[in-house]
Curated annotation (Swiss-Prot):
It is found in: Cytoplasm. Coiled coil: none annotated. PANTHER family: COPPER HOMEOSTASIS PROTEIN CUTC, COPPER HOMEOSTASIS PROTEIN CUTC HOMOLOG. This is PF03932 family protein CutC. The lineage of its organism: Bacteria, Pseudomonadati, Pseudomonadota, Gammaproteobacteria, Enterobacterales. HAMAP family: CutC. Keywords: Cytoplasm. Its main location: cytoplasm. Homodimer.
Amino acid sequence: MALLEICCYSMECALTAQRNGADRIELCAAPKEGGLTPSFGILRSVREHITIPVHPIIRPRGGDFYYTDGEFAAMLEDIRLVRELGFPGLVTGVLTVDGDVDMSRMEKIMAAAGPLAVTFHRAFDMCANPFNALKNLADAGVARVLTSGQKADAAQGLSIIMELIAQGDAPIIMAGAGVRANNLQNFLDAGVREVHSSAGVLLPSPMRYRNQGLSMSADIQADEYSRYRVEGAAVAENERNHCSPSGQMIFTVASCRPI
């Protein structure tokens, strides 16, 4: 039986994913930032109530992937916490100012992670040379890489994804961004073993009173009266339609556009 991974931004989403057939969860906060490190409260609650494997993201802020010393120190502390809480894996990524994988920091990340499976997220798509980056990540012992082939969506980047897959069996190449049921077969035909797609909806906030003249966001255009929710029916449908009984493919369903 193939694995189905859902990227969740709340305890409620994690429960929905689990109930509807997910085999693994990527846990994030802040969907509008593309996924940030979840709070301690969310981490502990999910660890206590979710029985399928959960991989939290370690990303202290939105934006680029070159971090200050203080930000990186916080990332290492978060990794230690995730490990202490008993999670089986995590998702993260760090770059140099020149767009290379920061190998010095990756060594520290891998040491802090210990036995946890590490996924290098779409910071990979911001690398100057994806093939050098993949070799470095293989040397570092990373389990998988999430990538759109350095294009706006994975369909456009499929040729690069195929070249990356041809480099070897490890790390696993997970295609993400714009992967849908109607183009999934293209990725399978290309030899993709894991894909990253969407199974969520934005719902209106239940707030009746709304102060339309005031925003709590730095982005005054931000919609603060909508909330992301994993759609159970979509999870179940994807699990039925796209999980191969051979167990050779992992279908990854993510909310919004997590890194």
